[in-house]
């Protein structure tokens, strides 16, 4: 069974005027129109969602900057430095982190054009180690997986990803496995990708275990 997050973000939304409501109605009901159709990558969808969450004071989540190795710097003036040569270094942790309802969030964003499975080689050892460390500190850790060809999105708990990655001779997670162990979310408008609905379910699951 695919787990669909329950609940609504309506309680968080500010009152909207008639004109804004008409715009939203037109946008959401026009056939085939959404941000995915406009060619947004998963990263762009998450970034847009994070802006919405921040502006609405729902959550504070940011993308971690990619570290850069500076190789050559010129100083044409004493007060000015010009970087002439630099290289992107491999990120040492994950893509995003932040706080929501007092809980620490840490997660990866991954997408594939495969239709039946997600390759585990897309996860690196340092990412698995980092997610494991955050889980030990009771953080909420997960991966947002997009099957681009299917336009399907899943919020998959890090614990499931870690176990699959560590399993000997396992090269991928099947779509069925992801369906059975994740919360599926739908792309939309305000926010573009409502992944916090899945986090609400993670929080509820933990509270039931206490």
UniProtKB/Swiss-Prot annotation:
Where does this protein hold Mg(2+)? 93, 95, 108, 127
> For site (Transition state stabilizer), what residue positions does UniProt give?
110
State the Gene Ontology BP annotations.
Answer: chromosome segregation; DNA recombination; DNA repair
Co-factor note (free text): Binds 1 Mg(2+) ion per subunit.
Q: Which GO terms describe its cellular component?
A: cytoplasm
GO MF annotation terms? endonuclease activity; magnesium ion binding; nucleic acid binding
Domain of life from the UniProt record: Bacteria
UniProt keywords, alphabetically: Cytoplasm, DNA damage, DNA recombination, DNA repair, Endonuclease, Hydrolase, Magnesium, Metal-binding, Nuclease
Q: Function, please?
A: Endonuclease that resolves Holliday junction intermediates in genetic recombination. Cleaves mobile four-strand junctions by introducing symmetrical nicks in paired strands. Promotes annealing of linear ssDNA with homologous dsDNA. Required for DNA repair, homologous recombination and chromosome segregation.
Family per similarity comment = Belongs to the RecU family.
Write down what this protein is called: Holliday junction resolvase RecU
Native source organism of the sequence: Lactobacillus helveticus (strain DPC 4571)
